[in-house]
Amino acid sequence: MQNYIKSEKAFKEAKKVLPGGVNSPVRAFNSVDASPVFMDHGKGAYITDVDGNEYIDYVLSWGPLILGHADPSVVNAITNSAMKGTSFGTPTEIETELAKLVIERVPSIEIVRMVSSGTEATMSAIRLARGYTKREKILKFEGSYHGHGDSLLIKAGSGVATLGLPDSPGVTKGLAADTITVPYNDVEGAKLAFEKFGEEIAAVIVEPVAGNMGVVPPIDGFLEGLRELTTEYGALLIFDEVMTGFRVDYYSAQGYYVVTPDITCLGKVIGGGLPVGAYGGKKEIMEQIAPAGSIYQAGTLSGNPLAMNAGFETVRQLTPQHYDVFRSLIKRMEEGLTEISNRHEVPLSINKAGSMFGFFFTDQKVTNFDTAKTSDLEFFRNYYREMLAQGIFLPPSQFEGVFISTMHTEKEIDATLEAFDVTCKMLRG
């Protein structure tokens, strides 16, 4: 039986100085009716909390750690970089090297700008799209979370879905009016929006695989339909690949689905666990950004050497073969979860994409936010706490993706399936 004495004490102290005791809402464990676990260290596929409890980690810092915790090459790259200085506020050669690697692997990107977070990447991409097209409206999809920028925090998923809020106080009516939302995977809904607002829409922003309503892949024709619509109406297509970049495929989601956007937003994996973001695209669009053009964007720590070195070393190590292994392991997980859930008569719907997957306690096929919300949240809460007690660390929200790393093997998958079996038996009696 796990004990969380030190975590509970740490949370009590944190609540004195941090809003809700955390620096990102989902970390508070509110949606699973529990107190957060405070972590101490990680290695490979495992993470250990301050009480000494060890877990198989499927959160992986919410996706960035595709090589697992404390990869020796990444740690070495960060250490060597830090010994030279943590930041200079000037260009460094490693920025160019990481940019070249990103351009080589992401089909849509000819030029890329480094920033410090995924939110900063999507906010900047929206500004760029508006400046480039001279239009103001943005089309996004219900349940898709593109960071906490005001323009995009409209009918968002992830932590917002967990909190039961359709948007956030503080987002002005004017910004909300310039954001059009339609259901994810609904090309016809997007067509209707363009028929009504087509000449005003600057861009469509979409996760090629939704990752903040759980994992929801695109249905056939969805991404292709968006590409056709944006081309027809002169709007830009923005892929938010902050989560899916280098997670879904060696060439990211756009390479896997063979749909090329005008602008791509990246983050997570390209920082190797350090704060990072990036946005890039066609040369003619990206050259509108200052100092090459007049659309302003800047950042004190943009392209900082620690994150650039960590990201370069992470992306450099990834090979196409890694993605074959990811798919094999997740197939093993899917087959095991399905067999166990059927045996215990637990409704379960599973989605997967590359090294990420999601599961919902529902008998419906999950293709959008509405179907994601049919998941049995009370069952999820109880399931989560039991899995945690058995040493399985999952995202503490039904509406988050689950990740594996190059350090996960059949051993970890099988241990997770065994824990799931025990949990289902316990909850179903």
From Swiss-Prot:
This is Glutamate-1-semialdehyde 2,1-aminomutase 1. Its cofactor is pyridoxal 5'-phosphate. It catalyses: (S)-4-amino-5-oxopentanoate = 5-aminolevulinate. Keywords: Cytoplasm, Isomerase, Porphyrin biosynthesis, Pyridoxal phosphate. It comes from Listeria innocua serovar 6a (strain ATCC BAA-680 / CLIP 11262). GO terms for cellular component: cytoplasm. NCBIfam families: hemL (TIGR00713), PRK00062.1 (NF000818). The modification N6-(pyridoxal phosphate)lysine is found at K268.
